[in-house]
A protein has these predicted regions:
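Juxtamembrane transmembrane-helix termini in multi-pass membrane transport proteins
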Residues: 1-67, 134-154
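Alpha-helical transmembrane segments and their lipid-water interface positions
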Residues: 23-24, 49-57, 121, 132-133, ...
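Juxtamembrane boundary at the C-terminal end of a transmembrane helix
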Residues: 192-200
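Hydrophobic/aromatic residues within the transmembrane alpha-helices of Major Facilitator Superfamily
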Residues: 14, 18, 47-48, 81, ...
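Selected transmembrane alpha-helices and immediately adjacent juxtamembrane segments
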Residues: 99-132, 138
């Protein structure tokens, strides 16, 4: 298991997810439910989603190496475009407005059922998310599924933990569109590096 891949995956997923709807969804849920229950629920959802992404990436490694690298590069570059578009969309808008849809989906439940409710909301929100595509690309690129899983899940747990504990405070000091642009640059760099390896 490569610690460098774990660190790289953590950094990439963290930067991409911090301005994502995942952060906002967790923030909104933590205002309705007990924060610990929210974190447990979303953490379980992230574990399953990341496992699925890593499995898909593992299957992709069975393809010819050059084809895998091209696909990974396209996913990275596609992610950069999507993040740039999101950054433009969020420029000058109130970030918390995007969380209203999650507030509507959150059912009025008590006790441990809040864990299940948080799981269901985040599992649906995260399906096909950019972090999943990025995880697939990283597994295909580095052939380190366990390292990618650890790095990605740790990043998602960290982002959701920040949302639960410091969400509103962070949104006052950090502009979402700036984070989107940073994430776009990370994906662009990974895409270019992968293409360089293909044609080197």
């Amino acid at each position: 298991m490569d610690l460098t891949v774990i660190a790289l995956t953590f950094a990439a997923i963290f930067v991409v997810e911090l301005p994502d709807k995942t952060f906002l969804a967790t923030l909104v849920l933590s205002t309705k439910y007990r924060p610990l229950f929210v974190w447990l629920g979303v953490g379980a959802a992230f574990a399953i989603q990341t496992l699925i992404a890593v499995a898909v990436g593992g299957v992709a490694t069975l393809l010819p190496t050059s084809l895998i690298q091209v696909i990974a590069a396209l996913l990275f570059l596609g992610g950069a475009v999507l993040l740039f578009i999101e950054g433009r969309r969020h420029h000058g808008t109130a970030s918390e407005e995007d969380g209203s849809e999650f507030a509507e989906k959150a059912k009025d439940v008590r006790g441990f059922r809040q864990v299940l409710a948080s799981f269901m909301v985040l599992f649906a929100a995260e399906w096909g998310d950019l972090s999943q595509l990025l995880s697939v690309s990283l597994v295909a690129r580095y052939h380190e599924p366990v390292a990618v899983f650890i790095g990605a899940w740790a990043a998602l747990l960290t982002v959701s933990g920040l949302a639960v504990l410091l969400g509103r405070t962070l949104l006052k000091f950090i502009k979402l569109h700036v984070l989107h642009y940073v994430g776009a640059l990370v994906c662009l760099a990974l895409g270019i590096l992968t293409l360089v390896e293909v044609f080197a």
